[in-house]
From Swiss-Prot:
Its main location: cytoplasm. It comes from Legionella pneumophila (strain Paris). GO terms for molecular function: ATP binding; ATP hydrolysis activity; ATP-dependent protein folding chaperone; unfolded protein binding. Residues 337-550 are annotated as: B. GO terms for cellular component: cytoplasm. Belongs to the heat shock protein 90 family. The gene is htpG. This is Chaperone protein HtpG. Keywords: ATP-binding, Chaperone, Cytoplasm, Nucleotide-binding, Stress response. NCBIfam families: PRK05218.1 (NF003555). Homodimer.
Length: 623
């Protein structure tokens, strides 16, 4: 008997979600069962965890399970669990509303590919709504563990924009979802069809999934049997687990639709005993760069689920890794706070980090094509590694990939080991340039002398690169050197002597240029970097790089005041022309023009672009 029944409207976003799910995934209908079983499994996990501190929640029934029953006469499928259950408020919140951000992201990720889109519903936590792909009405009966039988609820909807909810006495805790199938979906009334779907998607679920036994004639009996393996897969030895089972477990814990690139499964014995199963995904999740997004591994203690997104077992730069840690020695009532200062957790974290880096190194060595796919998805995150993890800096550095002047492509595919192996005889530094974009780096005038001498330069255009080179100042005994900071020594004594002679000859010109630019520059020098350009701006050796200054300014950060050094090419026709200009106004016009041109070529911005345009026009008129 239902009491205090109310009719409520779905949140606008849920209406939109229902429409998308039903109409986008109709050709892959079977995924409804995968999602509902996954939700039931989560409910059992939550109950077992909460019962660690409150055993009364079991209500004298600690035999946790999922059951599926088919009623051909009524054309229904019922998925039941004796997990944590739902209260009235939870039913309204979980079944009637959804986070707007989740809806927006779900919609933006839809591709029109049935196989891919069918997996997104789990990734975005909206798997329950897949029930409406096959059902024209869904009835949910539930009672949260610990509440009175009279607090049981019944929720019902036809997926048409509203739902009803009321109280109904329920003696047992947990949730029972009944799907009233649409006539065209009667294939799911077949016992063998349902068993096949369970075998395909849910065999790895560690809770038993029960269905009624079948006689040899295929008729149901009153007895139930377990139709999945119901084993914590990660506790088995590697030899006992098939590749397909590893992949299905990954998809279950990650809600990903693609197979992982690789994985590492380890049983550790000794002072501390634990199991780790770590996966490298094939693509980045939608929330990889959202600061508030939750990342981390699933934590179990002696096979008992403790928490999702345990971030303490991997550093943040490896937040893309999915997997499981099952520890034998941690207390069952461990909290996130206790995890922070636990010596065993620190030990597991160090081991997990080394295993992930080892996995990636193996992939980079043995399967360069797959590693390149990984880098294209996660390279930007991995570049955070040397900044965060000093202990593993060398191992991470070997995994980094870059664009270079030798590769001739924006694609980041050159390792530092490759760069070092190609270094010129006598070259003792790894040269790089940072810029706001690949094209800005590739076309920088600072590269001219390096191109002439055939010296390879790393082209760094990711924002994180400025921080990366600040923390990773050498590799394989070779110092990393910015070609846009300080002096460049390329071991050419003849050129150095020539510049010294020219400095004496051109001293009056240099002084005149300094007087024009005044406090806009730290100094004016002759350059040994340029072959084709008249001038360039560089940062002093001890100053912050010009690109870093721009990044910080764009972020609204305080930037130490530092002025660039203006370097001129004495062999360029425009610099030679300065000798012949007698008019001070014209000289000032030309010098200012050359300086601002150099700032723009280096990717900088001018304080007053309109003045620059006026100067260009004046020079064009006078030429």
């Amino acid at each position: 008997m239902v009491s205090k029944q109310q009719t409520m409207g779905f949140q606008t976003e849920v209406k939109q979600m229902l429409h998308l799910v039903v109409h986008s995934l109709y050709s892959n209908k079977e995924i409804f069962l995968r999602e509902l079983i996954s939700n039931a499994s989560d409910a059992l996990d939550k109950l077992r965890f909460l019962a660690l501190s409150n055993g009364s929640l079991f209500e004298n029934d600690s035999d946790l399970k999922i059951s599926i029953q088919i009623n051909e006469k009524l054309q229904t499928i019922t998925i039941s669990d004796n997990g944590i259950g739902l209260s009235w408020e939870e039913a309204v919140e979980n079944l009637g509303t959804i986070a707007k951000s989740g809806t927006k992201e779900f919609i933006s990720q839809l591709t029109g590919e049935q196989a891919k889109d069918s997996q997104l519903i789990g990734q975005f936590g909206v798997g329950f709504y897949s029930a409406f792909i096959v059902a024209d009405k869904v009835t949910v009966k539930s009672r949260r563990a610990g509440l009175q039988p009279e607090d049981g609820i019944v929720w019902e909807s036809k997926g048409d924009g509203e739902f009803t909810i009321g109280y109904e006495k329920k003696l047992t805790r947990g949730t029972e979802i009944t799907l009233h199938l649409k006539p065209e979906n009667d294939e799911f009334l077949s016992d063998w069809r349902i068993r096949g779907i369970i075998s395909k998607y849910s065999d790895h679920i560690c809770w038993p999934i029960l269905m009624k036994k079948l006689s040899e004639e295929g008729k149901e009996s009153k007895e139930f049997e377990t139709v999945n393996k119901a084993t914590a897969l990660w506790t088995l030895q590697k030899s006992e687990i098939s590749e397909e089972e590893y992949k299905q477990l990954y998809k279950h814990i990650s809600h990903d639709y693609m197979d992982p690139l690789t994985w590492s499964h380890n049983h550790v014995e000794g002072k501390h005993e634990y199991i780790t199963l770590l996966y490298i995904p094939a693509h980045a999740p939608f929330d990889l760069w959202q600061h508030e997004a939750k990342h981390g591994l699933k934590l179990y203690v002696k096979r008992v689920f403790i928490m999702d997104e345990a971030t303490q077992f991997l550093p943040r730069y490896l937040r893309f890794v999915k997997g499981i840690v099952d520890a034998s020695d941690l207390p069952l009532n461990i909290s996130r706070e206790i995890l922070q200062d636990n010596k065993q957790v620190e030990s597991i974290r160090a081991a997990c980090t080394k295993r992930v880096l080892s996995m990636l190194e193996k992939m980079a060595t043995n399967d360069k094509e797959t590693y390149q796919k990984f880098w294209n998805e996660f390279g930007l995150v991995l570049k955070e590694g040397p900044i965060e993890d000093f202990a593993n800096k060398e191992a991470i550095a070997k995994l980094l990939r870059f664009s270079t002047t030798a590769s001739g492509s924006e694609k980041q595919e050159v390792s530092l080991e490759e760069y070092v192996s190609r270094m010129k005889e006598g070259q003792d530094k790894i040269y790089y340039i940072t810029a706001s974009s690949y094209n800005a780096a590739k076309n920088s005038p600072h590269l001219e002398i390096f191109r002439k001498k055939g010296i390879e330069v790393l082209l760094l255009s990711d924002k994180v690169d400025e921080w990366l080179v600040g923390y990773m100042n050498e590799f394989a005994g070779k110092k990393l050197q910015s070609i846009s900071k300080g002096k460049i020594e390329l071991g050419d004594d003849e050129t150095s002597e020539q510049i010294k002679e020219q400095e004496k000859t051109l001293e009056p010109l240099i002084k005149h240029i300094k007087s024009v630019l005044n406090d806009r520059v730290k100094d004016v020098l002759l350059t040994n970097r340029l072959t084709d350009s008249p001038a360039c701006v560089v940062a002093d050796e001890q100053d912050m790089g010009l690109e870093m200054q721009r990044i910080l300014q764009a972020a609204g950060q305080q930037v130490p005041v530092s002025k660039p050094i203006f370097e001129i090419n004495p062999d360029h026709a425009l610099i030679k022309r300065l000798h012949d200009i007698q008019d001070d106004n014209q000289f000032e016009l030309w010098v200012t023009m050359l300086f601002e041109q150099a700032v723009l070529a280096e990717g900088g911005q001018l304080d007053n672009p309109a003045d620059f345009v006026n100067r260009v026009n004046r020079l064009l008129v006078s030429s």
